[in-house]
Curated annotation (Swiss-Prot):
Low complexity bias (residue ranges): 499-513, 601-616, 808-826
Name the record gives this protein: Ubiquitin carboxyl-terminal hydrolase 54
Residues with Omega-N-methylarginine modification: 12
Lineage: Eukaryota, Metazoa, Chordata, Craniata, Vertebrata
InterPro entries according to UniProt: Inactive_ubiquitin_hydrolase (IPR052398), Papain-like_cys_pep_sf (IPR038765), Peptidase_C19_UCH (IPR001394), USP_dom (IPR028889)
Coiled-coil parts of chain: 682-712
C-alpha cells in the first residue's frame, strides 16, 4: 500500500523514542525456547516470548506473589518458573515443557493445547491471559474483573459496548457490553478497506491506520434496523476503558493467504485508541497512543515472533530456539516477513508510558485456596459455562481462531452466557468450585452478577456516557425513557455516525469489486469463521460465518419463540431478528462446518446476534434477554461462539441511552434470572450441546487429519501453496491448467503407445515433458506442487526413454543382422531399458575368446581371449533383451554391465531375430532369452546374473578373440573348469558366431569379482563347443598361439590390461546405472545412422578383415571358428561360478591367466594370463586395445563419434567403447562371421561403453565420449583385426596398436583401411573420428556414455540393446555376444544408446574383444594382479597436434591413436586414464614396465591393411606395468592421459603425451591388447603411417 510508508515513517521513530531502554536488570538477554521434534510447541513459545518481552506485563507479573495454585496444572507457576529462567538462566535456550504440560492438563477436558499437537498461538496467548486472571483474581467477584492487580483485565482487556442505531428511524439495539482481550479483524476486510481509503484519500497518513482498523472491524457487519424499518445499519463500538496493551488479532481466510504481503504493508506502527473505536469514553484512552512492539506470525504450520527489544531498541526475531536480530526499523521486519511469507497473526500495541499493575489490592495468599484437580477441569476455560460452553464449543471446533475469539468472546459476557465466557477459560474455576450440577444455578447467578456489574459500570460512568454523548439529554434519563424513546440527538448522531462510516460502508460495498483479489481461496488456518457468501454479496468481502445452519435455524426460532417482557420495540426487533436470523442463517449456513466455526473479527457474529436479538436490553426483561441470548446464542453458540453477540460499536448517545436502560433492565432481570429455572436448564442444555458439538468437531478434525495423512500431504494441496503463488492467483490457475494439459498429453501419448505408434507417442511425451518443465517453474514457490510436477516429469521422462528405447530396438531389429546373426541380433535386439536403474556391474566390455589364460603362453593369449561358443550364445541371449538379463545374471560380475544393459534396454525391444540367429528362442519383450535369462528388475537381474554367471559357463566372460582364441579358450576350457567359464559372462552368439570378445559382467559384488579372478578365464570363457567347432577352435588355437605369440604381447598387453583392469576392478563394478539420458529420437537415429554408417564401413572392413584378419592372424581367425556352432554351444553352456559363487570375468583372473594374452605382447605371464581369466581381463584389454584401435578406427570410422576427442575424463563409456571396438577387431571371426561379429563387437562396444559410463555423464561428456567412441571403435576395428594377445593382470600392457595383424583392433582397422571396405586409411578415419565433432547423437554423447559408464555394464548392455544400434552385434558388455570377428574395426563408433550404452549402427559388425570396464571405485578382482589405470585424457587415445600421421592417411597411427584405456577398477566414478602415446612414438605404455612387452616396438603398428597379416598388429611388451615404468615413446615417456587436459587442445592434431603413473589400486587398465601376430608389421606400418 502506498500509505504504508506513512504509517511506518510516522511511527518508526516514535516507537524508538517512546520506548526508553530498560535497565539491564529489567530484561535479560533474549533467549530462545526449545521445541523438539514432535513437541509442536512453537505456538506456545511465540506467546511466551510476547509476554516476556512486553515490559508492562513482565514488570506487572513480577509483582504478583500470590495466586490460586492448581498444582502441576498451574499455569501461573509454570509461567513464573519460565520468567525466572528468562531472567536468571545462563542458558541460551530454555525449555517450555512445564508450561506446555500445565496448559495441556488445564485444557485436557476440552482437548485443547494437548501435548504434541499444534495449536493456535493467538488463542494460546488469549488463554494464558485468562488463566492468569483466574489464578490471581477472585472470579466470583470479578466476572468483569475490576481487580486492580489483574494484569489481564487492567492492561489487556478492552471493555466495550456494542450497539446499532438506525439513522432512519432512530431505533437502537440493546447495548451489548463485553470485554475482549484481542480485537479481531478480518484480513480480507482490512485489505478491502485499505483500498477504499486509498481511493478516497490522496495522501494517506499514519493516523489512517486506526480508522482503517475500525472500518475493517465493522466492514460488512451490517444489521437490520432494530425497528425493522428496512435500513441496514452498522455496529458501533465504544471503548469504556483505557488498556495499555491492545492486541489486534488478524483473522486469515487461509493458511497461505495471498493477502499476506498487502496486510503487512497496511500495518501501522502507531495506533490511537480514539481511531480504533467509534468512541472512547476514557480520557486517558482518548489521548493514548500505542506503538507496535510485537507480532506473532505464521507460515507453513509454524509460528514465530517479532518483538521490539526495548533494551537494545531493535527488532528481534524469535523462532523457537533461534533468536535473531532483525534491525532497528520496522521496515526491516516488513522485508523479512515478505521474504518469509509470514502472515501476521497477532499484533501487540503497547503504551510506552505504561506502568505495571498495582499490587496493593492483592488479597492475602490465604484467600486463594488451591483448586483441586477434581473441581478444576479444563472446562474452566469457560467453554463449559453458558458462554463458556459456547466458547468451548468454538474452541473445540478446532478453529484456533475460535479460541482466540473465545477470549475475545469475553464479549460473550455481553451475552449472558458470555458473562463467564468472556474469560474464555475463566469461569471454569468458578464452575469447578461449584459442582457441575450447580452450573445451572451458578451460571444463572453469574449471568445475573455480570449483568449487575455491567449495569453498575454503566451507572458509574454516566459522566463518561454523557461525555461521549455530549449534549445527549438522555444521559441522565431512566432506562424506561430510553426504552421508549431514543434521544433525538441519538438518531442525529447516528446519522452523523452513519455519515462518517458511510465511507467505510461505501468502501465495503465498493470493495466488492476487489473481492476477487481478496477472496480467500483456501480453508482458513486460524479462522473459525468463514466469510459468508451473502455477506460477500452485500458487503464486498467474505464475512466470517460463526454458526452453522442449525445454529441459524435454532437461532431464528428461538428468537421468534422467545417472548420478550417488553414488546415496545419487541415486535419490530423480533421481526427484524426473524428476518435477520433467517437471512443470517442463510449466509452463515453457507459452507458452515462445525469445525469451521470461525472467530468473528472482534465479534462480528456476536454483534450480529446481539443486534439481531429480538429484545433490546431495555425492552426485554433480563430473564428474557438471557433466554433469548442464551438460546439464540447458545444453540448457535453450539456452533457459534457467543461472541456472535459481542457488540461491535456503540455511539456515545447509544451508550447514554443504553446506560440507564440496561441498568433498569438488568436490575429487573437479575431476580428473574436467579429464579429462572428455564434459563438454567437452557444453559445446561447449551453446555451439553456445546460439548457434544465440540466432540463432533474434534472427531471431524481427527478424520480430516487422518485423511490428510492418508493422502500423504494434504487433501487440498492448494491450501498449502506458497504465498508467492497465492499472491499470483492467476498463476496458480495457470499452473493447474498446465498440469492438466501435460497430463492429458501424457495420457494421449500412452494411448498412442498402446496402439504401437511409438514415434507419435514419443513426440507427445516430449511435449508433455516440456509443459511439465514449464509448470515446474510456475510451481517453484510451492514445495508440494513442485514435488507433484517433478514426479510427473520423472514419469514422463522415463516413458520417453522407454519409447525411445523401443523405437531404437525396433530400428535395431529391423536392421539386417550380420552373418553372425546372433551377435547382431543381440546387439540390435538388446532391449532398451525403459528406465535404467543403477546397477553396479563389472563388465568386460567385450569378450572374445575366454580370457582364461592358456597355461601355454601362446595359448594364453588366445585362450584369454578365448570364449566358448556357448558363452557366446548366452552373451547373445544377454544381448537380446532377455539375453542381456540372462547374460547378466549368468555373468554376475560382468552381469552387472549386462544388467545395466538390461536396465538400459527393454527386453521387449530386443531383436528377436537375433535370438533366432543366435539359436536362442526369440523372446518377446522381456521373455527369457535362456531359461536362465529372464528379464528381471535390476536387483533380480543382479541375483540372476550371479546365478547365471554360474549357469553361463557357455557365456564365457571372454569373447573369443578369434577362432584360434576361441579354440584356445575351448582348449583351455578343457583345461579349465567350466566354472571358470561360467564365471566369464560373455554374451553368447548364435552358433558359429562366437564373439571374439566377451563382456564380463560383474554384479556389484566384490566377491564375484574376486571369485572371477580366481576362476580360470578359460573355463569361464570357454563355452561348450560342438566337436566341430572345438576342433576348429583347437586348430585355430595353434595358429592363434602362433599369432598370439606374435600378438601375445599386444594381446597380452591388451588382455593384461583388461585383466589388470578387471582384476583391479571387481567384476561387479558396482556402478549405479545412471538413468539413461532421454534423448530425442532424432538423436537416437542420428547415432544409429552415424553408427550404422561407421558400422557399415567397419563391418565391411571387418567382414573383409575378418577373412583378412583370419589370414593375417590365424589365431584371430580361429576365434571365428569358435564363433561357429561350437561357440554357440559354448553360448549355451553355463559357466560354473567361481568359488565365490560368482562368475569371474576372465579379466579378473590372475595375471597368470593373463600371461597367455601377453604371449604376443611378450607378457611373461602370457600363459598364466590364459590360465587365469585373461579373457575377462581380455575384454577389458580388448576394450583398452580397442581404444587404441579405436583411435585408429575412430579416424577410420570418420563418421563414428570422436570418442577419444571429446571424451571427458570421466567418460568411461567412450573408453570402454574404444576398448570394445578394439577388442572386437581382436577377435575376428571367420570370414563374414567376423564381420557379423564386428557388429557384435559393436554390441560389445555398447556394452563396454555403458560399463564405464559415469553416473554424472553429461552431454558434453557424451559429446566427448562420442568422439572417443569413434576413436575407440576405430581402434576396436583395428584391434578386432588383431588377435587378442593374452595379457597378465600385472602386465597390462597398453597396446594401442600392438595388435597382431588383423587381430589388433587397430590392425583390423588398418587392415580394413587398406584392404577392408573402409575407404579411408584407418589413420585417416581415426583422425577423422578423433577430430571430427562428435558425430554420435546426443544420446551417444560422452555425457551419456559417462553416465552409462557409471551404470557400468548395465548401460552398456542397454546401449547394445538400443534400437539405435542397427547392428545388434554391438554389445558393449559381452564380447561373447560377438563371434570372433576380424580385427578390423568397423568405422562405426559405438554410440551411447538412450539406455546409456554405446552401440554401433546396424550393419557394422565387429567382433569385440573382451574388455573389462572397471571404475576407479570398484575393487580389484581378487587374485588379479593387474594394475589398474584410470582412464583420463592422457590415457585415452589422442593424436599429437604435430603428428601429421594422424591425417586420414595414417591409419596405423590412428590405430596407435587408440590408446590403452585404463579404468579404475570398480570405482563408480570412472576416471579414464587413457594414455595416448605420441603419434610419432606410437602407442606407448604409461610405464615401460607395464608396457614394456606391449611396446617392444615403437608401439606404432604399421598401417595394417585388411589383408595384412596379424603381424601387422603392433606388438607391445606387457612386461611393463602401468605404474612400473615410463611409457615407451620418443615424444613422451608414456601414453597421454585423457583424464588430464592436454597441454594443447587434444582435439587438434597433437596430444601431448604425458605419462601419468597411477598406482594399480587407483586405476584399472581398461585397454584391450589384441594379439599381435603381425604386431611388428603393424608397428612398422603404424610407424610408417604415423609419427608419434
Amino acid at each position: 500500500m502506498s500509505w504504508k510508508r506513512n504509517y511506518f515513517s510516522g511511527s518508526r521513530g516514535s516507537v524508538q523514542g517512546m520506548f526508553a531502554p530498560r535497565s539491564s536488570m529489567s530484561i535479560a538477554p533474549s533467549k530462545g525456547l526449545s521445541n523438539e521434534p514432535g513437541q509442536n510447541s512453537c505456538f506456545l513459545n511465540s506467546a511466551l516470548q510476547v509476554l516476556w518481552h512486553l515490559d508492562i506485563f513482565r514488570r506487572s507479573f513480577r509483582q504478583l506473589t500470590t495466586h490460586k495454585c492448581m498444582g502441576d496444572s498451574c499455569i501461573f507457576c509454570a509461567l513464573k518458573g519460565i520468567f525466572n529462567q528468562f531472567q536468571c538462566s545462563s542458558e541460551k535456550v530454555l525449555p517450555s515443557d512445564t508450561l506446555r504440560s500445565a496448559l495441556a492438563k488445564t485444557f485436557q477436558d476440552e482437548q485443547r493445547f494437548q501435548l504434541g499437537i499444534m495449536d493456535d498461538a493467538a488463542e494460546c496467548f488469549e488463554n494464558l491471559l485468562m488463566r492468569i486472571h483466574f489464578h490471581i483474581a477472585d472470579e466470583t467477584k470479578e466476572d468483569i474483573c475490576t481487580a486492580q492487580h489483574c494484569i489481564s483485565h487492567q492492561k489487556f482487556a478492552m471493555t466495550l459496548f456494542e450497539q446499532c442505531v438506525c439513522s432512519s428511524c432512530g431505533a437502537t439495539s440493546d447495548p451489548l457490553p463485553f470485554i475482549q482481550m484481542v480485537h479481531y479483524i478480518s484480513t480480507t476486510a482490512l485489505c478491502n478497506q485499505a483500498i477504499c481509503m486509498l481511493e478516497k484519500r490522496e495522501k494517506p497518513s499514519p493516523s489512517m491506520f486506526g480508522e482503517l482498523l475500525q472500518n475493517a472491524s465493522t466492514m460488512g457487519d451490517l444489521r437490520n434496523c432494530p425497528s425493522n424499518c428496512g435500513e441496514r445499519i452498522r455496529i458501533r463500538r465504544v471503548l469504556m476503558n483505557a488498556p495499555q496493551i491492545i492486541t489486534i488479532g488478524l483473522v486469515w481466510d487461509s493458511e497461505h493467504s495471498d493477502l499476506a504481503e498487502d496486510v503487512i504493508h497496511s500495518l501501522g506502527t502507531c495506533l490511537k485508541l480514539g481511531d480504533l473505536f467509534f468512541r472512547v469514553t476514557d480520557d486517558r484512552a482518548k489521548q493514548s497512543e500505542l506503538y507496535l512492539v510485537g507480532m506473532i506470525c505464521y507460515y507453513g504450520k509454524h509460528y514465530s515472533t517479532f518483538f521490539f527489544q526495548t533494551k537494545i531498541r531493535k527488532w528481534m526475531y524469535f523462532d523457537d530456539a533461534h533468536v535473531k536480530e532483525i534491525g532497528p526499523k520496522w521496515k526491516d521486519v516488513v522485508t523479512k516477513c515478505i521474504k518469509g511469507h509470514y502472515q501476521p497473526l497477532l499484533l501487540l500495541y503497547a503504551d510506552p508510558q505504561g506502568t505495571p499493575v498495582s499490587a496493593q489490592d492483592l488479597p492475602p495468599h490465604a484467600q486463594f485456596l488451591p483448586y483441586t484437580k477434581t473441581c478444576y477441569d479444563s472446562e474452566d476455560s469457560g467453554h463449559l459455562t453458558d458462554s463458556e460452553c459456547n466458547q468451548k464449543h468454538t474452541s473445540k471446533k478446532g478453529s484456533l481462531v475460535e479460541r482466540r475469539r473465545s477470549s475475545g468472546r469475553v464479549r460473550r459476557k455481553g451475552d449472558e452466557p458470555q458473562a463467564s465466557g468472556y474469560h474464555s477459560e475463566g469461569e471454569t474455576l468458578k464452575e469447578k468450585q461449584a459442582p457441575r450440577n450447580a452450573s445451572k444455578s451458578s451460571s444463572s447467578s453469574r449471568l445475573k452478577d455480570f449483568k449487575e456489574t455491567v449495569s453498575n459500570m454503566i451507572h458509574s460512568r454516566p459522566s463518561l456516557a454523557s461525555q461521549t454523548s455530549a449534549g445527549s439529554p438522555c444521559v441522565g434519563r431512566a432506562g424506561d425513557q430510553l426504552d421508549k424513546i431514543p434521544p433525538r440527538n441519538f438518531p442525529l448522531q447516528a446519522r452523523g455516525w452513519e455519515t462518517e462510516s458511510t465511507s467505510s460502508e461505501a468502501k465495503s460495498s465498493s470493495s466488492s469489486k476487489y473481492r476477487p483479489t481478496w477472496r480467500p481461496k483456501r480453508e482458513s488456518l486460524n479462522i473459525d469463521s468463514i466469510f459468508s457468501k451473502d455477506r460477500r454479496k452485500h458487503c464486498g468481502y467474505t464475512q466470517l460465518r460463526t454458526f452453522p445452519e442449525d445454529a441459524a435455524k435454532e437461532f431464528t426460532p428461538d428468537e421468534v419463540s422467545k417472548p420478550t417482557a417488553n414488546d415496545i420495540k419487541d415486535g419490530g426487533s423480533r421481526s427484524q431478528h426473524k428476518l435477520w436470523g433467517t437471512a443470517r442463517p442463510g449466509s452463515h449456513l453457507l459452507e458452515q462446518h462445525p469445525r469451521l466455526i470461525q472467530r468473528m473479527e472482534s465479534g462480528y457474529e456476536s454483534s450480529e446476534r446481539n443486534s439481531s436479538s429480538p429484545v433490546s436490553l431495555d425492552a426485554a426483561p433480563p430473564d428474557s434477554v438471557n433466554v433469548y441470548r442464551d438460546q439464540s446464542t447458545k444453540r448457535p453458540v453450539g456452533f457459534v461462539p457467543s461472541w456472535r453477540h459481542i457488540p461491535k460499536s456503540h455511539s456515545s448517545s447509544i451508550l447514554e441511552v443504553d446506560c440507564t436502560a440496561p441498568m433498569t433492565s438488568w436490575t429487573k432481570t437479575q431476580p428473574l434470572s436467579d429464579g429462572e429455572v428455564t434459563s438454567r436448564s437452557e444453559l445446561d442444555e447449551l453446555q451439553e450441546e456445546v460439548v457434544r458439538r465440540a466432540q463432533e468437531q474434534e472427531l471431524r478434525k481427527k478424520r480430516e487429519k487422518e485423511l490428510e495423512a492418508a493422502k500423504g500431504f494434504n487433501p487440498h494441496p492448494s491450501r498449502y501453496m506458497d504465498l508467492d503463488e497465492l499472491q499470483n492467483q492467476g498463476r496458480s490457475d495457470g499452473f493447474e491448467r498446465s498440469l492438466q494439459e501435460a497430463n492429458s498429453i501424457f495420457e494421449e501419448s500412452l494411448h498412442l503407445e498402446q496402439k504401437g505408434d511409438c514415434a507419435a507417442a514419443l513426440a507427445l511425451c516430449n511435449e508433455a515433458i516440456s509443459k511439465l518443465r514449464l509448470t515446474l517453474h510456475d510451481a517453484s514457490s510451492s514445495t508440494h506442487s513442485r514435488a507433484l510436477v517433478d514426479k510427473k516429469l520423472q514419469i514422463s521422462i522415463r516413458k520417453a526413454r522407454s519409447l525411445q528405447d523401443r523405437m531404437q530396438q525396433q530400428a535395431s531389429s529391423q536392421q539386417p543382422v550380420q552373418p553372425s546373426a546372433s551377435l547382431p541380433s543381440q546387439g540390435g535386439a538388446l532391449p532398451q531399458p525403459t528406465s535404467e536403474q543403477p546397477i553396479t556391474l563389472q563388465v568386460l566390455l567385450n569378450q572374445e575368446a575366454q580370457l582364461e589364460p592358456c597355461k601355454d603362453t601362446e595359448l594364453g593369449a588366445t585362450s584369454s581371449f578365448f570364449h566358448s561358443p556357448a558363452s557366446c550364445p548366452e552373451l547373445h541371449s544377454s544381448l537380446i533383451p532377455e539375453s542381456p538379463v540372462s547374460s547378466v545374471s549368468q555373468h554376475s560380475p560382468p552381469g552387472t554391465s549386462s544388467l545395466k544393459l538390461l536396465t538400459s534396454f527393454e527386453v521387449d525391444s530386443v531383436n528377436r531375430s537375433a535370438f533366432h540367429r543366435q539359436g536362442l528362442p526369440k523372446a518377446t519383450g522381456r521373455t527369457e532369452m535362456n531359461s536362465q535369462h529372464e528379464c528381471l528388475p535390476l536387483d533380480a537381474l543382479e541375483d540372476r546374473l550371479q546365478g547365471h554367471r554360474e549357469d553361463n559357463s557357455c557365456c564365457s566372460k571372454f569373447p573369443p578373440r578369434e577362432g584360434r582364441d576361441i579354440a584356445q579358450d575351448q582348449l583351455f576350457e578343457g583345461k579349465k573348469n567350466p566354472a571358470d567359464i561360467s564365471m566369464g559372462m560373455p554374451w553368447s552368439y548364435s552358433t558359429g558366431e562366437a564373439t571374439s570378445e566377451r563382456v564380463i559382467y560383474s554384479l556389484n559384488s566384490p566377491s564375484s569379482s574376486s571369485a572371477q579372478p580366481s576362476i580360470p578365464p578359460y573355463s569361464s570363457c570357454h563355452p561348450i563347443t560342438s566337436a566341430a567347432s572345438s576342433p576348429v577352435l583347437h586348430a585355430a588355437d595353434p595358429m592363434q598361439k602362433l599369432n598370439q605369440h606374435v600378438q601375445a604381447q599386444s594381446l597380452q598387453t591388451s588382455l593384461t590390461s583388461k585383466v589388470v583392469r578387471s582384476s583391479e576392478e571387481p567384476y561387479r563394478l558396482e556402478f549405479p546405472s545412471t538413468k539413461g539420458l532421454v534423448r530425442s529420437l532424432a538423436e537416437q537415429f542420428q547415432k544409429m545412422q552415424n553408427t550404422s554408417t561407421r558400422d557399415v564401413i567397419g563391418s565391411q572392413d571387418r567382414s573383409l578383415p575378418n577373412g583378412v584378419r583370419k589370414s593375417s592372424s590365424p589365431s584371430d581367425f580361429m576365434p571365428p571358428l569358435s564363433q561357429g556352432p561350437g561357440r554357440e554351444h559354448c553360448r549355451w553352456v553355463k559357466q560354473p561360478r567361481s568359488p565365490d559363487g560368482r562368475e569371474r570375468p576372465p579379466c579378473w583372473e590372475d595375471p597368470a591367466a593373463h600371461p597367455p594374452l601377453s604371449m604376443g605382447s611378450g607378457l611373461p605371464d602370457g600363459e598364466t594370463s590364459r590360465t587365469a581369466q585373461p579373457r575377462l581381463a581380455e575384454p577389458d584389454m580388448y576394450q583398452g586395445k580397442l581404444p587404441q584401435v579405436t583411435d585408429i578406427r575412430s579416424k577410420e570410422l570418420g563418421s563414428s563419434v570422436n570418442l577419444g576427442t571429446s571424451l571427458p575424463l570421466d567418460s568411461w563409456v567412450n573408453v570402454t567403447r574404444l576398448c570394445d571396438s578394439q577388442v572386437k577387431p581382436s577377435a575376428p571371426g571367420p570370414g563374414d562371421k567376423s564381420s557379423s561379429h564386428d557388429s557384435h563387437p559393436r554390441a560389445t562396444c555398447l556394452e563396454r561403453s555403458p560399463i564405464l559410463l559415469h553416473p554424472h555423464w553429461d552431454q558434453d561428456t557424451e559429446q566427448e565420449t562420442s568422439e572417443l567412441e569413434s576413436l575407440y571403435q576405430a581402434s576396436l576395428q583395428a584391434s578386432s583385426h588383431t588377435a587378442y594377445s593374452d595379457w597378465r593382470s600385472q602386465d597390462v600392457a597398453w597396446q594401442p596398436l600392438s595388435l597382431a595383424g588383423s587381430a589388433d583392433g587397430m590392425g583390423r582397422r588398418l587392415h580394413s583401411a587398406p584392404g577392408l571396405d573402409l575407404s579411408k586409411p584407418l589413420t585417416a578415419e581415426m583422425e577423422h573420428v578423433l577430430y571430427e565433432p562428435s558425430t554420435v547423437p546426443v544420446s551417444q554423447d560422452s555425457s551419456n556414455v559417462r553416465k552409462k559408464t557409471l551404470e557400468t555394464g548395465h548401460h552398456c548392455s542397454s546401449s547394445s540393446s538400443l534400437p539405435v544400434i542397427h547392428d545388434p552385434p554391438v554389445f558393449l558388455l559381452d564380447p561373447k555376444l560377438y563371434p570372433p570377428q576380424p580385427q578390423f574395426l568397423s568405422p562405426d563408433v559405438l554410440m551411447p544408446s538412450m539406455a546409456g550404452e554405446p552401440y554401433r549402427p546396424p550393419g557394422t559388425s565387429r567382433s569385440v574383444h573382451q574388455f573389462l570396464a572397471m571404475c576407479d571405485r570398484d575393487e580389484t578382482p581378487q587374485g588379479v594382479k593387474y594394475t589398474g589405470r584410470t582412464l583420463n585424457y592422457r590415457s585415452l587415445p589422442h593424436r599429437s597436434r604435430t603428428d601429421a600421421s594422424w591425417g586420414p592417411g595414417s591409419e596405423t597411427n590412428q590405430h596407435i591413436g587408440a590408446r590403452v584405456l585404463t579404468m579404475p577398477a570398480c570405482k563408480p566414478q570412472l576416471t579414464y586414464t587413457a594414455t595416448l602415446p605420441e603419434r610419432h612414438q606410437g602407442l606407448q605404455v604409461p610405464h615401460a614396465q607395464s608396457w614394456g612387452n606391449l611396446f617392444h616396438s615403437p608401439s606404432h603398428p604399421s598401417a595394417v591393411h585388411p589383408g595384412s597379416p596379424p603381424s601387422s598388429n603392433l606388438h607391445v611388451p606387457l612386461r611393463s606395468t602401468w605404474n612400473s615404468g615410463p611409457v615407451l615413446g620418443s615424444r613422451t615417456p608414456g601414453p597421454r592421459r585423457i583424464d588430464m587436459p592436454p597441454d594443447d587442445d587434444w582435439r587438434q592434431s597433437s596430444y601431448p603425451s604425458q605419462d601419468r603413473h597411477r598406482s594399480p589400486g587407483e586405476e584399472r587398465i581398461m585397454f584391450a591388447l589384441s594379439n599381435a601376430a603381425g604386431r611388428e608389421q603393424n608397428r612398422v606400418r603404424f610407424l610408417q603411417h604415423s609419427r608419434w
